Amino acid sequence: MTAAVQSPTVNTTLNYFREVADGGLSEIRHGTVGSTRMKYNTQPVVVNDIRSNEGEFSLDKQGFQLVTSATKVKAFDEKTVKEQYYEELIDLIKETTGASFVLPMNHLVRQQLWESIHEIPADADDAAIVDTTAAPAMSVHIDQTPEGAELILQMLMQADAGRLGKTRWGIINAWRPLKLIRREPLAVCDVRSVPDSDLRVLGVIYPLPDGMVYNGSSDLKSDTWNVAANPEHKWYYASNMTPDEVLLLKMYDTKLDGRARKCPHSAFKRSYDEGPARESIETRCLVFWEDQERE
């Protein structure tokens, strides 16, 4: 079978936030059937391929950056990722950003079809548990609001949060294919094309691991951003990404000097997508520049 010829632009649709007045949600419980039933405002968009001009895009300018960085890791099980892969990412992010301290927080290995988590019986209870993290995330979002990012800092750094929080810090996601991407690639939006008026807070309730309590609760409520549709948004992706490449996305940055501080993103479908489920690993990292002022 001959592979489809890829165009420098892709006409597709993205799932934007549906306003609450139109049936959307303002809060979900992560990992439940109810969260998979969230309704969106699906809109046509054009996604531009950055191949041949990758160097024009950076974390501080558009909010994302493609870097070439082969990994020595062969197996992406929990133990190997935390003991070996995290160390590679720490070095990569320090080298790319000039950060002095990088702390990988968690990671998601995605290797299921998006359809698999949506083939749920209509009579299933909204509160029933379902794994929603193993498939591509097919909605436009930013992982943390500033308040959500501050909550993560306080939770993970605890006694050091006060000291580190006085310097410049942020959150960066590192997205790497585990195999050549043939379907549902990741789209990223130039944040300069996204006014704050397009951002919508979505509260997410996360059940904490067994035995863990935060502020007296076994649940953690944090805020993320969903994004309302706007034809002015500028969308991009890197075609045919390989395991030797990493797409860095900025989720938060304390600097208020005009640089990019966030990056809306979403997986998307193309008419010529083919093959088995996409395989990727996404790692979320706290990043600190201890030699720079917070703002």
Curated annotation (Swiss-Prot):
S-S bridge residues: none
Q: Any idea of its EC number?
A: 1.-.-.-
Q: Which GO terms describe its biological process?
A: terpenoid biosynthetic process
InterPro entries per record? AsaB-like
Pathway assignment reads: Secondary metabolite biosynthesis; terpenoid biosynthesis
> In the record, what terms sit under GO molecular function?
oxidoreductase activity
- Which keywords, in A-to-Z order, does the entry hold? Oxidoreductase
Which NCBIfam families did the record assign?
CmcJ_NvfI_EfuI
**Protein role:** Hydroxylase/desaturase; part of the gene cluster that mediates the biosynthesis of enfumafungin, a glycosylated fernene-type triterpenoid with potent antifungal activity, mediated by its interaction with beta-1,3-glucan synthase and the fungal cell wall. The pathway begins with the terpene cyclase-glycosyl transferase fusion protein that most likely uses 2,3-oxidosqualene as substrate and catalyzes glycosylation immediately after cyclization.
Please give the family membership noted in the entry.
Belongs to the asaB hydroxylase/desaturase family.
Name of protein: Hydroxylase/desaturase efuI
